[in-house]
């Protein structure tokens, strides 16, 4: 099977922004495998049965999912067994350099470790997700998303997440039973499916994506 293009996304996050928050209901997943240079914290609810692809990791997710993805790490979701009813997503993107002047300070040590572990994707425990849900919603529902208060909220959220001792670093493993048992083709088949189905929907109006090769 040939190599699959990975779309290079230009996010709406500008050099003048500290971070970007997006929340949206979803009726399914059809965005292709993509990569961008910003860190991304992605929260999903009511998406049990969907597949999460981060780097070379392929996993079927539960009804709650929260993952931190470092910049430059390819990622995507696929419907798989998800009934796609009432899916809700919160996505937070921030520059890798946001905490550069602070990250080596003692108070930020756990956050630094968390960011390092996010290079292959970092999934948080269900207990942590249940404890942080309200803070994520408060951040995403604020009518002044650029406020300094929201920046402090983001720092608090990241600090709390960095203390999750049950957080799990993703590895190059396919844990989806009966999805694709061929180790050689498992990733290529999933990624090619996402890519080809997206190409059927793409229009000339989309200008912010440039294919790069894995």
Stretch-by-stretch model annotation:
Residues 122-128, 141-206, 210:
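Short, Lys/Arg-enriched, Trp-marked, Pro/Gly-tolerant hinge/linker segments that flank
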Residues 1-66, 73-76, 108:
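Generic protein-terminus/edge-of-domain signal
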Residues 55, 95, 195:
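Residue-level recognition of the GNAT/N-acetyltransferase active site
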Residues 2-13, 73-135, 166-167:
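A hydrophobic/aromatic-rich effector-binding and dimerization subdomain
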